[in-house]
Amino acid sequence: MGRAKKVVLAYSGGVDTSVCIPYLKQEWGVEEVITFAADLGQGDELEPIRRKALEAGASQSLVGDLIQPFIEEFAFPAIRANALYEGRYPLSTALARPLIARRLVEVAREVGADAVAHGCTGKGNDQVRFDVAIAALAPDLKVLTPAREWGMSREETIAYGERCGLPAPVSKKSPYSIDLNLLGRSVEAGPLEDPMQAPPEEVFAMTVSIDAAPSEAEEIEIAFEAGNPVSINGQRLDPVALIREANRLAGSHGIGRLDMIENRVVGIKSREIYETPGLLLLIQAHQELESLTLAADVLRTKRQLEMQWADLVYQGLWFGPLKEALDGFMDRTQSEVNGVVRLRLHKGNAIVTGRGSSDSSLYVPEMASYGSEDQFDHRAAEGFIYVWGLPIRLWSAARRR
């Protein structure tokens, strides 16, 4: 008896997920494999991917356009949370996984499957994200993980596929592992595994190099409503179009490249190259607007919780109770985050040159000014400082007894 009768496989068209199709049927006795490929704005032509799955033995090959929910339900909450894993990585890949898992479960219910499957290996983060998300959404569904269990090297995996009649991958000579969607690209493996080796220019596709970036700076304005970006340079855009425009603007000035050593969920360190031009630009602008519109204690608390929010998403806990609770806090703070931020884009840098809010700003010029319009009561400072410093004076006096 096989491990499952009908399986829905998360499918990318790559080597591992293509080999998963015959492997599930021949080695694990699965009767029927249905594939699902998600369109997340990665720019791939999905019809060849759909046909490839059928040629590999899938009974059905489904494709789903998830671009709009990806941006509205996953990217925008990350912007509102200023989500940067380990202070740098804006979770461009991690944000896609819970959405794919959610749709995978929905497809499994629609076709009456008793299991879902993915092609993640045992060393990466995505296996955790898929398995935990599926467990949260459908604990009754079995999760099959052939690539984690088959113990084959990449060369052996390709050879297995060729024995099953699959064509050799076009990218067989490429040493890199690449994941991409509308938010960005992640590149790893090959020569990048040496942390001292500079990444070659060939690994980048969404951003120009600093040398190739324009010598003349460009100023732009980004407007936010309730913490969500809504327009660039006065042009109101739908969420997907806004991300595309932010990618274009930032990428054309060499903004959005990351080269970092990150701590994976499974306990190892890995070297990752990321390109996330638009997302990093929007988070920077959003942070700046919050500094103008949020009360000091709210802002400090939010900065602490942002790190935890990013950790939860990175670790695959999107559908967990703590993430849900933090969402409530984040959403409550954003009603006041309305306004415009101006940035100067130049040679890999986005420099804030202005910020304003007509209805939410907590910056009061008359209180901050040192000129004749100053309305701050300087005489009140003496009493405030006395009370503020009283614990220190009492502590100091006690030490001298």
From Swiss-Prot:
Which top class of enzyme applies to this chain?
Answer: ligase
The protein's superkingdom reads: Bacteria
GO BP terms in the entry? argininosuccinate metabolic process; L-arginine biosynthetic process; urea cycle
Which pathway is this protein engaged in? Amino-acid biosynthesis; L-arginine biosynthesis; L-arginine from L-ornithine and carbamoyl phosphate: step 2/3
Pfam families noted in UniProt: Arginosuc_syn_C, Arginosuc_synth
Recorded GO terms, molecular function? Answer: argininosuccinate synthase activity; ATP binding
Question: Which protein, by its recorded name, is this?
Answer: Argininosuccinate synthase
Q: Which organism is it from?
A: Synechococcus sp. (strain WH7803)
